[in-house]
Amino acid sequence: MMKKIALILMLLPLMPMLAQSVALDNLQVHRVGSLAKEVEGTSTLFFLDGRLWTCNDHGQLRLFALDTLTGHIDSVVDLGVKVYDLEEVTQDDRYLYFGDFGDNNGVRNDLCILRLAKSDLRKKRYRFDTIAFSYPDRASGVLARNFDCEACTAIGDSLYLFTKQWISQGSTCYVLPKTPGRYVAKRLFHFSSRGLVTGACYLHGSRCLVLLGYNITLQPFLCILEDFDGKSFGSARRLTLDISLGTQAEGIASRDGRNFFFTNEAFELAFVSRKAALQKIDLRGFMKKK
């Protein structure tokens, strides 16, 4: 957490250079409730078997089921594996993919995604495969901080990663196979996200991708990508929405493709203190009807 705060303070002089988007009055955000201390570092959200889940971002990996009406923890599952900086969980029909690829300073050489079969999870057999990877173009020095990553989604036979670029305030999309092994990620495209991308939610039925993030002042934003050709998100129609409620937004999930849940990490700096929270937002008025 302190590393993130330090980087934010370092980037404050760049604020006048950042592109601005417009906050919309009809963007309805509902604060569900505060999150418990066990998940105040929440970095991801996902639905599984009708329940909303998050997990801790380091140490012994545990899953926490959250009550969607209160944000309270309903149950806890200890997966028996340690993670260094877990930032995202995505899934397909058969597997969960745990993204241990957080890298604030761009120095890690052990980036990986842990794969767990849903059938094993339900049987309480926690056997993980590993998808290890590196970036083909990772910079050195301060620019290495453009290779942090907190957003990933599974589509077809691939995993799509969106970097969190502390220096350029943009994001680059990379792709990996979903099968265990060691890979060099393939670079697809770069786009100006107007801030730090921290979560991804792909709607398979409507072929829509929603990215979550926050800008240099910690204001959350959403980037909706639609009308793209196949998996070429670079050609998508993009709409960026500012969210007036909350700070450092970290995880996003939807069960129906209309109402989205997202989380805010706990934040404390000088005289500013914010508890971790679960929020809910209705995006029906901002997405194309399919």
Region annotations inferred by a language model:
Residues 1-26:
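Bacterial Sec-dependent N-terminal signal peptides
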Residues 20-290:
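Sequence/structural signature of beta-propeller domains
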